[in-house]
Amino acid sequence: MGKQMKEIIKAFKQKDYTLFDQFYEMTNRQVYYAIIQIVKDDEIAKDLMQEVYMTFLNKIDQFKIDGNVYAYLSMMGRNSSINYYHKQKKEVHSDELIDMIESDEGVNEYDDTDDILSLLNLLNKDQREVVVLHTINNLKFKEVAEIMDKPLGTVLWLHREAINILKTKVGDWYEK
């Protein structure tokens, strides 16, 4: 975690929330994509994001300063989405990613959410989750494996399969 993020977390632990807007700007995409891949509804995703941030701030004392805040918030978002899903007893829709998947920048600078979601919809649930956690949330494969409770080799294989699917589909779209 960067020095700036550590300072923000320290301020939160002292009940100083003046840097919340900055914190939100640094983390909202990761939380949004962790949620939207499960609930598939923008308004619900935004509501769940509010819950995630409120819960995070209410339980800030439990968060370790050296912890990965992005992974922590993503996991909270994912869990809140799953809880919402179970409460609603809705069928989970599949979701998938983009042609920027292999870039080092991930999709943090990419603003076309609809394109991202339609590409994510090309993948199965596990592939999509690996892509979102690794590419959008910038987590290391080892962290993704821990979150998904899968062996590292499986996570790497799922990522490679997802990349191949996305390359094929994106290529087909460009040829049209």
Regions found by a protein language model. Give the residues of each.
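Internal acidic/polar
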Residues: 2, 83, 90-118
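Sigma70-family region 2
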Residues: 13-14, 51-68, 87-89
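Amphipathic, Lys/Arg- and hydrophobic-enriched alpha-helical face
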Residues: 24-42, 59, 120, 169-172
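Structural recognition of an alpha-helix C-terminal capping motif at a helix-to-coil junction
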Residues: 33, 47-54, 67-79, 157
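Arg/Lys-rich amphipathic alpha helix in sigma70-family domain 2
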Residues: 61-65, 75-95
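DNA-recognition helix of helix-turn-helix
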Residues: 82, 146-176
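A short pre-motif secondary-structure segment
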Residues: 130-134
